[in-house]
Amino acid sequence: MNNRIILFQNFGLKHWIDMFNKMHAFTEVRNINTYDEIWFLEHYPIFTQGLLQKINTITYNNDILHDIPIVSTDRGGQITYHGPGQQILYFLIDLKRRKITIRDLINIMQNLIIETLNYFSIKSHIKKNSPGVYVNNKKISSLGLRVKKGFTLHGLSLNVDMDLTPFNYIYPCGDINIKMTQVKEFNSFLTLNDIRVILIKKLSQLLNVSIIEKFSIK
């Protein structure tokens, strides 16, 4: 098994629970010969609550949430929203084999977003003690990971071209002061595919690997 290769898959628009189960199933059966993978996808509308979830982070009652489901999950972080037009990356990485820490991976993920946005002339930044990436002090990318037996699950989301309204129903990441933004507000011509191509290129550089589509491996 070549450790200089990470496989990627583009799943398109999927239900959250299906992909949650799929990544856990992948992690349960993987071994020292299993390639690391990064999954690209979007989710149908859903609110997910992480392990650090606090009370009173939903601003409206369920009748006003327009039937968007709310689920608790096993990633870090607090509440966020996923919906079509948001690029999600799940990182299924063997930390020990890559000789990196969870903090290293978080830094890589944040730099990935910053460098990708910079490629499109969108200047972004991080905030101390507030994981994620921001543009003009509005959040454009959220992070949330879990480590199980040295393997990572979950990952990041990047708002590209989506309806941001549901973020108004919650306090994103449990912070009443966070406002959300997306790529569309700075470049209305970019597509998810445009973003995905550069994400793969930057991932390859940051992880010093070849990012190869899974089904091209013989």
Curated annotation (Swiss-Prot):
Residues that bind substrate: 75-82, 142-144, 155-157
Subcellular location: Cytoplasm
Keyword Transferase among UniProt keywords: yes
Pathway linked to the protein: Protein modification; protein lipoylation via endogenous pathway; protein N(6)-(lipoyl)lysine from octanoyl-[acyl-carrier-protein]: step 1/2
Catalytic activity: octanoyl-[ACP] + L-lysyl-[protein] = N(6)-octanoyl-L-lysyl-[protein] + holo-[ACP] + H(+)
Superkingdom to which the source organism belongs: Bacteria
Keywords, alphabetical: Acyltransferase, Cytoplasm, Transferase
Gene Ontology cellular component list: cytoplasm
InterPro entries for the chain: aa-tRNA-synth_II/BPL/LPL (IPR045864), BPL_LPL_catalytic (IPR004143), Octanoyltransferase (IPR000544), Octanoyltransferase_CS (IPR020605)
SUPFAM superfamilies noted in UniProt: Class II aaRS and biotin synthetases
Site (Lowers pKa of active site Cys): 139
EC number(s) reported in the record: 2.3.1.181
Domain BPL/LPL catalytic: from-to ranges: 32-211
UniProt GO BP: protein modification process
Active site annotation, chain numbering: 173 (acyl-thioester intermediate)
CDD domains: LipB
Family statement drawn from the similarity comment of this UniProt entry: Belongs to the LipB family.
Function field: Catalyzes the transfer of endogenously produced octanoic acid from octanoyl-acyl-carrier-protein onto the lipoyl domains of lipoate-dependent enzymes. Lipoyl-ACP can also act as a substrate although octanoyl-ACP is likely to be the physiological substrate.
NCBIfam families given in the database record: lipB (TIGR00214), PRK14342.1 (NF010922)
Matching PANTHER family: LIPOYLTRANSFERASE 2, MITOCHONDRIAL-RELATED, OCTANOYLTRANSFERASE
Protein name, UniProt field: Octanoyltransferase
Source organism of this protein record: Buchnera aphidicola subsp. Schizaphis graminum (strain Sg)
